[in-house]
Amino acid sequence: MAVSVSAPVLSLCYNQSGELSRSLGYRLPKKVGFSSGRRSVSYIGFGAEKVGRFRVRVPICRAVPPLLFKDLDADDFRHPFDKQNTLLLRAIPGLNEFGKALLGSMTEQIMLLENIGTSVLVSKNQLSDLHGLLVEAAEILNIEAPDLYVRQSPVPNAYTLAISGKKPFIVVHTSLIELLTSAELQAVLAHELGHLKCDHGVWLTFANILTLGAYTVPAFGQMIARTLEEQLLRWLRSAELTCDRAALLVAQDPKVVVSVLMKLAGGCPSIADQLNVDAFLEQARSYDKASSSPLGWYIRNAQTSQLSHPLPVLRAREIDEWSRSLEYKSLLKRANRKSTVQKV
């Protein structure tokens, strides 16, 4: 990813709240979730099999090769709210220059060492199954695969860091890997790749600093007006919808992505096999109905206006609707079937 400013890009996905990172002063989210969904094909990488109280992951392979989007452009799947809000942000005078002044090489180096120094680099010779999931997801989205690190943490999370002049990388926590099936984990990686594919760049950095709220610059909160903060949060929510679409392009099954959001809302490994995607989609429709009245609309707006991510039920409804759209079906028609099936 080519970032236009010398600034870190931190993508903290699938979260509503966070805990403080001591060394950086950033808040990292407490939860991230993808849950299993029914698929017509199996997945490269890890399958999940329950043995007693434990989930044992076993290598599996796709029964059908995935579709590849060789000529895929970011605007082919970018959410219209993402397009609209990005244009509004670009129209704010001096914001890009402010980013250069605020986020310098010191911040870059701290974040780089914080992530790399405490993690395991994934490669063909290190966690090769996970490496295969990333490489395939990047191939499907027509993007160069970034580096991938696994970090020991009890907090399920995944995020992306892109630093000007350096190769971007994704970090996943060990607890997230334990929580997910291979399909879900690859969808998480695809979501993170979506941020790189769409060059979300400095806007994502600003939004994360504002929403995570712990960047140690004196009087930072007073330097940005509330209207700008609201605009950045609105953009960040729309960017997440875009990256959910990237997850669908890789999963190629909407139930995989919807079940991700269901687990985010209220799932854990011990009850994963009892979760019902169709019931969760019905719940999303009931939320729309409940918030359709004037009072419901006001409550819904108050509930979501300060969030960095859309509500899980709204994301589920959005991705379900897009999976049935002409736009998505047109992309599938343009895609080519991968010629071979890999086993990892």
From Swiss-Prot:
It is found in: Plastid, Chloroplast, Plastoglobule; Plastid, Chloroplast membrane. Keywords: Chloroplast, Hydrolase, Membrane, Metal-binding, Metalloprotease, Plastid, Protease, Transit peptide, Transmembrane, Transmembrane helix, Zinc. Metalloendopeptidase with a Zn-dependent proteolytic activity and substrate cleavage upstream of hydrophobic residues. Positive regulator of senescence, probably by degrading CCD4, thus participating in the controlled removal of carotenoids from the thylakoid membrane during the senescence process. The keyword Zinc applies. It comes from the Eukaryota. The active site is at E192. This is Plastoglobule-localized metallopeptidase 48, chloroplastic. Its cofactor is Zn(2+). Binds 1 zinc ion per subunit. Its EC number is 3.4.24.-. It holds the Pfam family Peptidase_M48. Mostly expressed in flowers (e.g. sepals, petals and stamen), seeds, leaves and cotyledons. The chain crosses the membrane at residues 102-122, 169-189, 201-221, 256-272. Interacts with plastoglobule (PG) core proteins ABC1K3, PES1 and CCD4. Belongs to the peptidase M48 family. M48D subfamily. One of its GO terms (cellular component) is plastoglobule. GO terms for molecular function: metal ion binding; metalloendopeptidase activity. CDD domains: M48_Ste24p_like. Its main location: plastid. Disruption phenotype: Delayed senescence. Gene3D superfamilies: Metalloproteases ('zincins'), catalytic domain (3.30.2010.10).
